[in-house]
Curated annotation (Swiss-Prot), chains A, B:
Highest taxon, organism lineage: Bacteria
GO terms under cellular component: aminoacyl-tRNA synthetase multienzyme complex; cytoplasm
Gene that this sequence comes from: proS
InterPro entries for the chain: aa-tRNA-synt_IIb (IPR002314), aa-tRNA-synth_II (IPR006195), aa-tRNA-synth_II/BPL/LPL (IPR045864), Anticodon-bd (IPR004154), Anticodon-bd_dom_sf (IPR036621), Pro-tRNA-ligase_IIa (IPR002316), Pro-tRNA-ligase_IIa_arc-type (IPR004499), Pro-tRNA_ligase_II_C (IPR016061)
UniProt family annotation: Belongs to the class-II aminoacyl-tRNA synthetase family. ProS type 3 subfamily.
Classification of source organism: Bacteria, Pseudomonadati, Chlorobiota, Chlorobiia, Chlorobiales
Protein name per the record: Proline--tRNA ligase
């Protein structure tokens, strides 16, 4: 049963920790900065993996697996890459009881080890494109960790593609950030802003980084996925050339893109409440719990509960019955609210006599009566669809309510304490750094979505919110996880 | 297209390497002893994972994820365990640019890190059983590596369960080795012998190890899966006690069980031939290739091919069309034989006119005519089922043909050069070690399957094949991968 969860209002950070622990989603391990993803948390990851993997395959990608150890000399081949990643790597110096001739880095990301293979596999334009994804664990040494959001080891997928020309690579970059957007919005019920990162925020080794950014319930931003245009940087670092259709040699064009178990943290922070986890039905491994009220003819109540569960499962709605007598219905209500089961069905002898049951929604706590008739499965399905839709709309409304367009520095400073701020920026690293120093807010994204750009007149020229210099566009600022 | 594959007869080891490379299943990487699992190989692993994961869940298990780093002090807690595993570990000594206070071992297996969590999660019999599985990468430093069969890093699943009494733990051990048997026989079409390992071959830290052993086409044995009864060893090492139903404290009973990407090597060695990979249809991500013979009205032939592919896919048979004009039909035949596509359909204008197509089986190369009628999908399905069945029976026949019951030392020595030898053993470590030293053969398994025991009169007392001392039972000897 739930330990007491601190309320969001009282202490948002503590609420998050309490929730993750109480709902048994994850635990810190005895290894510094590493987490244990417990079965309840891992079940969410499995649903995410299944949906994403299907979308990757539909867009022509195949899975493969590359070594997790990267020789030090490989990491060093791409200058920006080593500068960005080497300081946060775990380093293997001994193996099989002996000191290694060359140190091995545990992959923080796999561009280098993968391009050392691509070099062998790609000779001609006929070998392109190469569209490969990998599901793997990666390690980035973190000083300050937070379950799911920032841990030394985490799970992710990383796509690595190779193309014959820059246009095709750029198409891939955009295709995949849009796949992430679709996943975030349609599965996670989490609205995101699609766009580009500023130079200072882009991936170490990329020409350009695209991202999806979401707003959490405390108004902070969370980067939920990235897609990088790597240009010819890694092909040059690994001397990966191919013969073009025209018969000349050129370096291969590359992309990479990834999302991680961080998405579980985003999911929690986007929707959950003071009673526990709130899961969008599409990512709930268990969508409906039936709690029989065991009075009168208990076996008859149980039989009805099982019958309904069977019908719902047959209809593709993942349902289970908790008919244990160790715990009271009230205890069970609280427990499954904590676990984020989207729909609870209460069923007692009187309900059965009246041919109905009580259906409680996790998102709104609204209770309705549903008839135990031939349309029941469809009615429950509709409720699940409504929950999915409502979570998205609620989160979108929240984001809109907590986004301000700042025209003064005072508005800006107040705005980033509360949510996203849309403001003019002069385009310089210096101003960006200054704003970060003074407010802890960073440029989260330079939106590329037309609708979003129009909504906030992002293309309107103006003066920079901090420097007062001319600015050609507005960008989105926020504090971030 | 295929590089030339060495024939099995000429050089079995080279045949294996050639096949793995030519069919693009895996590649050595630039990291010592580590492999790249290429998309064709990984697709097999994905099919294996899906089938096994389903079977684990049906038997009540859930997935979770534990850190891959294990503090040195944890490994040291179970005496036999550290002795067995420490010498083959990769060791992280630096992280985030600094030397670590305590070295971290990259997991060679996860008993220790998992039991350090179980200790926190288990207080009472109500918390038991705990039935958790993990899909992960592990590292065991190997001096002599072979793609899939023995590499420094490999992928696997490891189940770790906790129970309130030894009977339930033993039931779990047997349940899971039987799950592996079912998987090996029904999906991999690979007959296996189920049984116990001798003391010297059991897992470091286990009271007993059960295994499934398969025969490869060179007569060698391959251990394809293990299930360990860990007794209270790890619970004691991690001081994991629970309150029993009777209200007293006791140590928790444990099991662990695993299979790895080694199964892909087993699959190759069990069925494949000099033309390339032979895949059982249940593990083929692509089961049927349609090769249109592009003569006459090419577009009409193509349209028919696509129509058939659509019908087969709709029926749940994974089918694709190769209608490229860059390569000849003959080239395609060889290429898809190399890749192990179970069924090839050839379809030319004359076939279409006659309302039929040619269906070629990968396992027997047999060609039959199949009518392009309403029963076609079912006929193809039947052929796929026949292939699955035939591969199993062929492998079983091969195993029987290459198993000898030895009653003299000469017979024994000749037998282990060819396959499995069933012989009396006096039950001592000394004799076992002597036999290994003299013949390189080891005790692969002490069968527990009644049918197998009867077939070879394993319970018949006799005299030890090597020492001449009294022996209460026969066991299975072989050279092994």
């Amino acid at each position: 049963m739930a330990d007491k969860i601190t309320s969001r209002q009282q202490d948002y950070s503590q609420w998050y920790i309490d929730l993750v622990r109480s709902a048994k989603l994850a635990d810190y391990s005895d290894v510094r900065g590493c987490m244990v993803i417990r079965p309840n948390g891992y079940a969410i990851w499995e649903k995410m993996q299944a949906a994403l993997d299907g979308m990757f395959k539909e867009t022509g990608h195949v899975n493969a697996y590359f070594p997790m150890f990267i020789p030090e000399s490989f990491i060093a081949k791409e200058a920006e890459h080593i500068e960005g990643f080497a300081p946060e790597c775990a380093v293997v110096t001994h193996g099989g009881g002996e000191e290694l001739a060359e140190k091995l880095y545990v992959r923080p990301t796999s561009e280098t080890i993968i391009w050392s293979s691509y070099k062998k596999w790609i000779q001609s334009y006929r070998d392109l494109p190469l569209l490969i994804n990998q599901w793997a664990n990666v390690v980035r040494w973190e000083m300050r960790t937070r379950l799911f959001l920032r841990t030394t080891e985490f799970l992710w997928q990383e796509g690595h593609t190779a193309h014959a020309d820059p246009e095709e690579a750029q198409e891939e970059v955009i295709r995949m950030i849009n796949v992430y957007r679709t996943f975030a919005e349609e599965y996670m019920a989490m609205p995101v802003i699609v766009g580009k990162k500023s130079e200072s925020e882009k991936f170490a080794g990329a020409d350009a980084t695209y991202c999806i950014e979401a707003m959490m319930q405390d108004g902070k931003a969370l980067q939920a996925g990235t897609s990088h245009n790597l240009g010819q940087n890694f092909a040059k670092a690994f001397d990966c050339q191919f013969q073009t259709k025209e018969g000349v040699l050129d370096y291969v064009w590359a992309t990479s893109w990834g999302v991680s178990t961080r998405l579980i943290g985003a999911l929690i922070m986007a929707h959950s409440d003071d009673k526990g986890l709130v899961l969008p039905p599409k990512l709930a491994s268990r969508q409906v719990v039936i709690i029989p009220i065991l009075k009168g003819d208990k076996e008859e109540v149980r039989a009805h509960a099982r019958f309904i569960a069977k019908a719902l499962n047959k209809h593709g709605i993942s349902t289970f019955v908790d008919d244990s007598e160790n715990n009271s219905p009230g205890w069970k209500f609280a427990e499954y609210e904590l676990q984020g089961i989207p729909v609870r069905i209460e069923l007692g002898p009187r309900d059965i006599a009246e041919g109905k049951c009580i259906v409680a929604r996790r998102d709104t706590f609204e209770k309705t009566e549903v008839l135990l008739d031939a349309e029941m499965t469809e009615n429950i399905e509709e409720i699940l669809n409504n929950i999915q839709q409502n979570l998205y709309e609620r989160a979108l409304q929240f984001r809109q309510d907590n986004t301000v367009e700042a025209t003064t520095w005072e508005e800006f400073k107040a705005g980033v304490e509360k949510g996203f701020v849309i403001a003019h920026w002069d385009g310089t690293d210096e101003t960006e750094a200054l704003i970060k120093e003074e407010t802890k807010a960073t440029i989260r994204v330079m939106p590329t979505d037309e609708e979003y750009r129009k909504q906030y007149n992002m293309d309107e020229p103006g003066t920079c919110i901090r420097s007062g210099n001319p600015a050609t566009q507005k960008v989105v600022f926020a504090k971030a996880y």
